[in-house]
């Protein structure tokens, strides 16, 4: 049975021309115990030009991240095209259909949620969230975008994960947040 990141929270935010993504560090084995508190579920790929965050089975998420990076190379860094092509092969391959993970991918201009059922979703409001604490983080991010307009996208993402961590028992406060302003 693969180890799952079901109990995780990932959020991506576009605000005032900035894009940022954040995730917590908790890995829960089933619903029984915390296996690790410092996992890195948000990372840079494609020479730092793309940020990817994942929820789901650890092995499956790494497999999909690798396939996504190959698609990025194949399509010269075109995030939308790479996302659509990954979703096509993910949905069309019986072995890949068994993978249990979701990805959020972003570059400096756009972001997408990519799932195994073939969805590639771009948000209307510049916010995407996945994982067990995703709805809590999403609500926090929406409030921040509306009422704390001076806050950076990266700070909003961190705060949203921390709010989720206050509510969701499967999300911790070991937040990794990345943006495109600096190498983290």
Curated annotation (Swiss-Prot):
Known EC number: 3.4.25.2
Sites where the protein binds Na(+): 165, 168, 171
Gene Ontology annotations for the cellular component aspect, listed alphabetically: HslUV protease complex; proteasome core complex
Swiss-Prot/TrEMBL catalytic activity: ATP-dependent cleavage of peptide bonds with broad specificity
Family: Belongs to the peptidase T1B family. HslV subfamily.
PANTHER family: ATP-DEPENDENT PROTEASE SUBUNIT HSLV (PTHR32194:SF0), METALLOPROTEASE TLDD (PTHR32194)
The protein's role, per its UniProt record: Protease subunit of a proteasome-like degradation complex believed to be a general protein degrading machinery.
UniProt protein name: ATP-dependent protease subunit HslV
Upper taxonomic lineage: Bacteria, Bacillati, Bacillota, Bacilli, Lactobacillales
